[in-house]
Amino acid sequence: MAAPRNVFKDRLRSQQIGLFATLNSPALAELLAGTGFDWILIDTEHSPGEMGDVVAQLHALQGHEISVIVRPAWSDMVLIKRLLDAGAQSLLIPNVQTAQEAASAVSYARYPPAGVRGVSGGSRASQYGQSADYLRTADEQICILVQIETPLAVSNLEAIAAVPGVDGLFIGPNDLAASMGYLGDAQHPAVQAAVVEGFARMRGAKQAPILTQGRIKFAAFKLRRTARFGDLNGLLPVLDNMAHSQPR
């Protein structure tokens, strides 16, 4: 049995639109799989989701065309190993500020000698040992995206982008705004200017500019600047807007 290809990684330089899922609901994840989005991100950084919640959502999404990204709570060797063994192929690593931190994240996702990922002979990722080529092909199918969320990370952007195994950069305006002194104001002109500058520098570094999370207005602003991986909104705001739009 052949190991699955990472379709999201194959299409990384085409514009893909998706949603952040923070409610830990397999039913909602399965519902979203049929709505035409390119990807769904299962979040464990800003949600109470644990490993069992992630696996349940991966099960619900299996067999659907939608791609799945998982965000670990932190760039941690054990967390990353467990998510990859559970079957995640694309990870969004939060709060990466230096090239060394990016290199560490990549190493956690790769088997020796390229990295330090522990080897399981019967993980869900290898279809419980039935994928004979999983260990041989896993490293090339793993997609590592890193979040640029602070002025320090922005200043190190080119060095982070140059780390082998970093497949894309995420500019997160909410944390960037907070770290710039504009907590809760990702629309501030200084924050938007920093995002535009970051996108330009990504292109200079030959990295595909990637998503930013936030309101639709800000996402559209970003996508017009050739983002390749766009998050038009999170699932929670979508549901909130739907609920508030219903007649009373």
Specify the residue positions occupied by each region the protein language model found.
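N-terminal amphipathic alpha-helix/helix-capping segment at the start of soluble metabolic enzymes
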Residues: 1-20, 131-140, 197, 203-204, ...
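Active-site mouth loops of central-metabolism enzymes
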Residues: 12-26, 68-69, 73, 143-155, ...
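Glycine-rich, proline-tolerant flexible connector loops at the mouths of alpha/beta enzymes
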Residues: 28-56, 173-189
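C-terminal alpha-helical cap/extension of soluble enzyme domains
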Residues: 117-130, 142, 148-155, 186, ...
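Conserved, mostly hydrophobic/aromatic
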Residues: 19, 32, 43, 91, ...
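Alpha-helix-loop-beta-strand connector modules within alpha/beta enzyme cores
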Residues: 51-85, 107-114, 136-140, 187-210
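Conserved anion-binding
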Residues: 78, 88-164, 178
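Glycine-rich phosphate-binding active-site loops on the catalytic face of alpha/beta enzymes
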Residues: 90-104, 169-180, 217-241
